[in-house]
Design a protein with these regions (language model features):
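Hydrophobic h-region of N-terminal signal peptides that target proteins for export
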Residues: 8-17
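Sec-dependent signal peptide recognition
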Residues: 1-9
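Mature catalytic domains of secreted/periplasmic carbohydrate-active enzymes
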Residues: 16-356
Length: 356
């Protein structure tokens, strides 16, 4: 009788196979996990706008103003590394449209400047300095172009995509492709000096750009924008995420019709979406100084080490990453104040977390 009972109890165990474990909800990709481990990185703003002492270039600056006599990529990268930064993103083109590499897409580029007699490539120098120092390297290329006469037409979109192709193919593996949500407004536009408005829900055709270019040419690059696809903007430029921060996010705004950079559910960007459909953690961006570009009148107004550490705890400590804006002077160097603060911040991070 006991044998029969044992057999009867054994039959279900033999017949019923355990179900394989199923993932719960949205999950991170390998590229996103690599980004998460970066924790703190920097965003370098350095264009003719620096020499104009502005925050937003209009697109009409003479390339001749761009001449950083003592530019030293190693100094900038070294200071960033001493601050505990593990990567740098270079603004290769800001809204003013000036390209820091010798592009074939527009004459408004570094080859028309007197720097290195027009033979320089600032993107190359920063990229090589990052590789040498062991830092990751990424690219920011503004979709809005206040210099280009064709901005707002289909022809400009082809120009922008060709700029991305050049950047993706010339400067090695990128850890981020950074896309700003600012687009459309007044500008030089080849001399028109007018205001132009575009429908950002359709004009850039981001799905095509990111799928056909970024994913194919730079598969390891995390796409950053208001909506991701990989990393989302936190919704402020103060350097912190909400106390409750979900890596999952539903980016479509309440007003619809779809989410694109510049048209996103910013009300929940800082917190994210509990049980959200997409894994899109937040980047918390903030400049070391009051502005993203260098302004001599802001010397002495840099964030303190204690302020930076508090931002670290409110960004990285909440499951996001911290993107710290660095602004070289017109000499092409980080100011000594910035270098000192970065070094002290890096030491504070080391001393605080040296014991696990």
């Amino acid at each position: 009788m006991q044998v029969i009972l044992f057999i009867l109890l054994l039959i279900p165990a033999l017949v019923l196979k355990p179900r394989p474990l199923q993932p719960y909800g949205a999950l991170p990709s390998e590229r996103q996990l690599a980004w998460q481990e970066t924790e703190v990185y920097g965003l370098i703003h350095f264009t003719p706008t620096t020499f104009e002492n502005k925050e937003w270039g209009y697109g009409d600056a003479d390339p001749a103003v761009f001449n950083p006599a003592h530019f030293d990529a190693d100094q900038i990268v070294g200071a960033a590394k001493s601050g505990g930064l593990k990567g740098l993103i270079l603004v290769a083109k800001h809204h003013d449209g000036f390209c820091l590499w010798p592009t074939q897409t527009t004459s408004y580029n570094i080859s028309k400047s007197p720097w290195k007699n027009g033979e320089g490539d600032l993107v190359r120098e920063v990229e090589q300095a990052c590789r040498k120092a062991g830092l990751k390297f990424g690219i920011y290329c503004s979709p809005w172009d206040r210099n280009n006469a064709q901005y707002g037409t289909p022809d400009y979109l082809e120009t922008y995509r060709n700029q991305l192709k050049e950047l993706y193919s010339r400067y090695g593996t990128l850890f981020m492709s950074w896309h700003d949500g600012a687009n459309g407004g007044d500008g030089y536009y080849g001399g028109a000096r007018e205001k132009r408005k575009i429908d950002n829900t359709v004009y850039y055709d981001w799905e095509h750009t990111w799928n056909d270019l970024t994913r194919k040419m730079q598969p390891s690059a995390n796409i950053f924008s208001d909506i991701g696809w990989d990393v989302r903007w936190v919704g402020n430029e103060k350097g912190y995420a909400a106390e409750t921060h979900w890596a999952t996010f539903n980016p479509v705004p309440e007003s619809g019709p779809k989410a694109v950079p510049g048209n996103v559910n910013t009300r929940t960007s800082s917190e994210g979406t509990r049980h959200g459909d997409h894994w899109i953690p937040a980047e918390c961006d903030v400049p070391l100084r009051p502005g993203w570009f260098y302004h001599p009148e802001q010397d002495g107004k840099e964030k303190s080490v204690d302020q930076l550490f508090e931002l670290y705890l409110k960004s990285v400590g909440r499951g996001a990453c911290l993107d710290l804006g660095l602004a070289p002077t017109t000499e092409g160097l980080l100011h000594t104040n910035d270098v000192q603060i970065l070094g002290e911040f890096g030491n504070k991070l080391k001393n605080t977390f040296k014991t696990n």
